[in-house]
Amino acid sequence: MDGGNQSEGSEFLLLGMSESPEQQRILFWMFLSMYLVTVLGNVLIILAISSDSRLHTPMYFFLANLSFTDLFFVTNTIPKMLVNLQSQDKAISYAGCLTQLYFLLSLVTLDNLILAVMAYDRYVAICCPLHYVTAMSPRLCILLLSLCWVFSVLYGLIHTLLMTRVTFCGSRKIHYLFCEMYFLLRLACSNIQINHTVLXATGCFIFLIPLGFMIXSYARIVRAILRIPSATGKYKAFSTCASHLAVVSLFYGTLGMVYLQPLQTYSTKDSVATVMYAVVTPMMNPFIYSLRNKDIHGALGRLLQGKAFQKLT
């Protein structure tokens, strides 16, 4: 792995966050538990929404797609992480690393864009309730989701193709658990200025513009809520947005901890922040959305009761 320029057929070594066998065992069980909780939580959300016709609304349509994205997101990284934590062979092929990177970038982008669309849905529901049914028609919902997928696929494809132009020299040891773009760029020995430029340009378009849109949407939502005369009405309106606002804060907070810093200062200590957005956020989303949501509680109850009844009969 050391010395010289290396071809596309070579491998990277994912050394993880620690080389201590004891710490690796702890990390294995921790990530396995988090993965199982994430899968269970997101699958239950998807099944509850799809099985209950009362939840066939734009808000829950996008929530189900967000859960699907989170499910795919953790499955892209955690299984390989678990294998590496239990194995002496920590190699990942060049093609495997780029494939993992592509899905990582695409799914983070998809999460971000779906959150922006969900903010628009809440804005229309609270600020323009009389026009909600026509404004958020099934056709528009499918169109918005399709655009989210198109932009996400393109974003991941652009940066993955740019990564194929990067030359890696010397050690290909990645002191982390999966192929993350900043760690890969730190191993480059060729000129990566174009990667920086495109990353900044596309990042502003894909992340900062949706963030600005969400901030503007919630500013209008807050103004609309403050104009509601009754305290009960204010509470009900705010409760429909609180969970989404919490998820947005968690998503952008952890993402900002990783990417809002110069590439040269990026180090393994920042891997904790990467774990936050790559593992913790997808795990927490189902709990945040269902914590005080009576509709989700009811749908989950009916789903589980139906499964139990089927077993009895």
Swiss-Prot record:
Q: Name one GO cellular component term.
A: plasma membrane
Residue intervals annotated with topology Extracellular:
1-25, 80-100, 159-196, 260-271
Q: Where primarily located?
A: membrane
Q: Which residues cross the membrane?
A: 26-49, 58-79, 101-120, 140-158, 197-219, 237-259, 272-291
Locations listed in the record? Cell membrane
Q: Entry's InterPro entries?
A: GPCR_Rhodpsn (IPR000276), GPCR_Rhodpsn_7TM (IPR017452), Olfact_rcpt (IPR000725)
Alphabetical list of PANTHER family matching this protein: OLFACTORY RECEPTOR
Q: What is this protein called?
A: Olfactory receptor 1D2
